[in-house]
């Protein structure tokens, strides 16, 4: 009872002075866990409290401990007194805490720690001697980090069950012999960041369970005691980083004693400066093998130590190396994972023990050179493989650009073409009618051009050649050439020389619509002068066609076959207009015949046998010859005007299909464009078939008939083609001798002046210009054979072979050339020419006055005149 009263009194007194007896404001909890025989501690604390609170807590703590019942004391196993500003601590006052297992006195200013647990000598204490025996039997963890402790606490040996001791961040300067003596259960000692200079080699003597010794960031310089400790405890983990080690020859001898892996790590420790080390960086663990081969002559310093330890087993050791900065401050929470972990757990956390691990070796120069050479070769090969196609391509382009003669060959080829074109032009000059060239009837003499400005409105089409079965590379006989031209001229679209012809006279009905065609008129003679051999066989077929067209334009007229489409385009015209115009043509033909006789040309014999007819025919030829003398003046005038002037004097029949064409420049150009459009949509094969079909029904006949001296005279033209067996009928022969009888009346007509003839023609032309629509094609085209200024010599006159029984048809006149349906010629025709024909002499004939633009007069008024 006395004890109870005393306790109540003390409690009341404490409440009066303090004001309250409660639990401290800052609470900390400590949990102790046991796993596999090891202790693990976890704690949390608040370190920022005032000094007054610490004092109150300190007083209340002791009062509470003092007056606690014994039943509660036994259940207290974790006690945390961190950051309480304690300077001196005596564990004797905690002797009644028999269940205490972990005591944390870190982050204080403790500079003296008394662990004397001896019993007092008083009688009262003697009475309770048995009660205080074996105090703190379960204390296993003692944490004293971040204090001001110097030497090892006294009486530490009395803590028999102590397993872990943390003295980090204190002021220890050395470890003596008796520092940890008696702590047989001690497993881990943390002496990090102290000022330890020396360690006694036997400081850890008797600590057979020792596993971890942390000596990082200390002031150690000598390695001899460390080597002794390593040999004593082969499984000991030593933290030796961040120390100023002094390596000498004895250390080199130690490397010979230890294994190769230990020697490499030891060399790294000696050569690594302290400043380069990083905090809390664990180095690899090295285990020293038991079979240590001692050198034959070890150093004198270690010889005695090795002999003293020779009897002890050498099981090997693990040296734990890590780095830390000198100025780093390690907190209590940073060390909790190290203090309470067993050596096995530490090794597992660090990746397990590494045996015989080798550090980085010095680089091998030979290997580096070999690797560099190999890599260089591989890179060069790859670059060459990838760049080779591009290099070859550039080389080929350069060779093509610099190839000699490539551009010269092209220019030479063009020059060759120009020379060849010039030769074609010269060969064209061999024709009899050089006036045709001077009149610029063919503006483009290059046969390679597809379209030529031809006054006839004819367009040369290559498809015509294909439809007629012509091969440009092959040479054809005159007969074959006539066949091909004959097939195209049947429908009125092409001359026999290969040129496309379009209707020129619009508004006139065809001759077939007014006059039936007799079976005997299917074929008429065509002068063999139109068929001549080519000048040179190497020239193309197109050149032959050009030459023949030029000659044909000078020798005679070009009647064209009349197709069925002509009826729709040509309206009916009065016959008296044509009849009046035919009189003038007859007069011109009479003068032509007379002059031809004077020059020695054979005169054609008219079919009607009339003297008046011969006179009229000669008048027509003579008028045409007079027009040819005006060649020089025609060259200065526009092409269309010259053509209109020449065409106005062509022979026309009384049938509307043979009326002369009267066209202006605009009409000729538009007709030419129309011809190109018609030929563009032309199919050669279909057109050939159509030609044969149309030729069987239609034809043209050019005749000169006379019904009286002043009556109607008409020129009829028909073309017919007999398709029996695909062969043409033989041509009628000509008899040039019979025609000479018709020349007797030529002198009677010579008195007619050319001026009257021109006036008549102008009047008729003006009258016909109002009614007729001219096109690119004319039914009849006449030109004279020679110029007055450049008369033809006998050597210039073309000759051709004719059968002796040849006779001129009734429609043939001297100086005219009729193109109709031409059948194939059975015999070859030779064209003889002179070298003088190759030149184009400038004709100095006086220019004729231009055609008067007077208003056209009525034909009836002209007849009255």
From Swiss-Prot:
Residues 470-479, 702-713 have a biased composition (Polar residues). InterPro entries: Leu-rich_rpt, LRR_dom_sf, LRR_TM_domain-containing. Glycans are attached at residues 42, 248, 787. Residues 675-688 have a biased composition (Basic and acidic residues). Residues 463-522, 654-749, 840-865 are annotated as: Disordered. It is found in: Membrane. This is Leucine-rich repeat-containing protein 66. It is a multi-pass membrane protein. SUPFAM superfamilies: L domain-like (SSF52058). The modification Phosphoserine is found at residues 714, 748. Its main location: membrane. GO terms for cellular component: membrane. Keywords: Glycoprotein, Leucine-rich repeat, Membrane, Phosphoprotein, Repeat, Transmembrane, Transmembrane helix. LRR repeats lie at residues 138-160, 161-182, 185-206, 209-230, 235-255. Residues 728-759 form the LRRNT domain. Residues 855-865 have a biased composition (Acidic residues). Pfam families: LRR_8. The chain crosses the membrane at residues 4-24, 366-386.
